[in-house]
Amino acid sequence: MTKPVLFSTRSSNTSEEGQLLVEQIWTGNDYRNFNYLIACPESGEALAIDPLEYDLCLATAKGKGWEIAQVLNTHHHHDHIGGNEGIVQATGARVLAHAEAKGQIPDMDEGLVAGDIVKVGKTVELEALDTPGHTMSHICLLSRSENAALFAGDTLFNAGAGHCKGGGHPDSLYNTFASQLAKLSDETLIYPGHDYIVNNLNFTLDREPDNSSATKLKSEIEKQDTNNALVTNLGLEKEINTFFRLQSSSVIATLRVSFPDLPEELDDQTVFLKLRELRNVW
């Protein structure tokens, strides 16, 4: 029996978001990946997101009585597409990804562009967001159901942002944050591609030592069971994620210590890019 996710709280790793079921699968691998199954409660049809540990995904679907009909890759990195073949061989699922990832993801069946709707079963509709930055052909999926949810891949992490060292660009990542992610409702639940939350909170506190929300959350989740991980929402991310806190006086003050030659007037993009530069070597 599923248990609803209330914003910014723990729940069982299966949650019910309006008219869809979400299964967050902790892989326990060295990459600290989360894999996801999204299922239609009426038909039992499921979509697998970045199913690197395909055996876990298949076993979970079987245990739930779900049938995986589609795979969605948020981007082309191996730790997100490495399980495609196993899922496809077992289920015949179709593989979806960003339209411009066609030459990077083997046996891709359908390319998505911004605004495309991915349908799962009878009730589930997910909007494709074109979210370049981590890579230039990255897709996030947005559910606009009763409890909005973002399946963020490696664009947005809990308390952090994706790096751009594997074919992306930090200017594009900033634009994705500023023009898309920051404009989503604060209630939007965040489902990232990896569990980096503790290290990301450490970075937030290095940049903004007086961030009481980050301090409190870190003390609460340092020893969390990642099989039952915290699900944040965008409102909480705006409190604890330094990449959303570009006008914080503390963030700017510590940034000036790291980069003494910064101009007196700083725009948000410059702050974001300098934070990303620091996080690259954190």
Question: In which residue ranges do the predicted regions lie?
Answer:
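Active-site-adjacent loop/tail segments of enzyme domains
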Residues: 160-187
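Active-site-flanking alpha-helical
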Residues: 82-83, 139-141, 161, 201
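Conserved beta-strand hairpin/beta-sheet module of binuclear metal-dependent hydrolase folds
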Residues: 10-66, 141-153
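Active-site metal-binding loops of divalent metal-dependent hydrolases
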Residues: 51-52, 76, 100-101, 134-135, ...
